[in-house]
Amino acid sequence: MHRSRTAPRFVVLSLKLCLLGASAQAGADDHDRGFYVRFEAGLADAGTLESLLTAVDHPTRCDVLLYPDPGLAPSSDAACRDNTSRPVFDNSFDLGSKFAGGVSIGYDLGKLRLELEHLSRHQGGQTVPARTASGNVVIAGKGNEWSPVDPPTERVSDFSSREFLVNAYWDFENDSSWTPFLGIGAGWARTNLRYQVRLLRKTLAQGYQDVAPPLTLADRPAAAAGSLSLFDHEFRGDVFGYQILAGLDHALGDRTSFTIKVRWARFAELTGRGIATVIRSHAPVQADGTTPFGSDLEFDGIGNVGVSAGLRYHF
């Protein structure tokens, strides 16, 4: 899930290019300079979002709240006393392509342009089968506990991102009315999403206690049959990122131009912690009956590939 932090290098490179470009443009004609505003709209494809849920998890038989007398729970078992936090679910989601719109204010130095940009986008959501993280023997051992009618799922929904970036563009001026340009930018995104994982156990009629060696009935307390475990939490935060841009400007007059632009943007991981909504149809607590059942989430792959069109007006 962790990726190298290349964004700071982009910031340094951006500043160097800006200073170099500004020096080169010191003698530019006055008519090439000035403030401008741009409005744009288009589509942004969010690509694949990766999630990782990490938590402390115990075998079902360890849950003291499943017994009429908590002393009947095998709390002395090594597995019941293991409070190591491990990856539980590791999944990916396709958030699809949705509308994106933005506004920018910039200053034109001739070939070099400096710009402040705000882009807003709302992506879709996706529900996928829950995927057990590799190496987690506890959650893997519960595979035969889940309902065959309503199997475990994970869902990401309500994804939104408000991005604030500083961009630098270089215009490749020529004799035509079309001006190609390249750009780089860096900034942050105020990101929001909802994540859910839902686990429903078999009922007794569906065979919850139909076990085969080495399992015994003690591994499947009857009170757990048909129970629901649900984690449903909203995550939000500011994540740093960078983008690469390219496009064409077409002059419509002395002050107005039409812009077509493509972008590739990537942002850092969004992380957070939440408490489960319900665990085995009782309070969201660990197997000891008191410790809150918390989970840590990481979301990687935040970014987009987008195309937009808009108008730029020079003051």
Regions found by a protein language model. Give the residues of each.
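Outer-membrane beta-barrel biogenesis signature
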Residues: 22-38, 48-57
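Transmembrane beta-barrel strands of outer-membrane/channel proteins
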Residues: 39-43, 107, 116-120, 182-188, ...
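Outer-membrane beta-barrel channels and translocator barrels
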Residues: 32, 109-112, 173-177, 251-253
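Membrane-embedded beta-strand positions in outer-membrane beta-barrel channels/transporters
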Residues: 36, 100-104, 165-167, 243-245, ...
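Extracellular/periplasm-exposed beta-strand and loop segments of Gram-negative cell-envelope proteins
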Residues: 47-96, 119-163, 189-239, 268-306
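Cleavable N-terminal export/targeting peptides
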Residues: 1-32
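Residue-level signature of outer-membrane beta-barrel architecture
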Residues: 107-109, 170-172, 248-250, 264, ...
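Outer-membrane beta-barrel "beta-signal"
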Residues: 36-38, 301-315
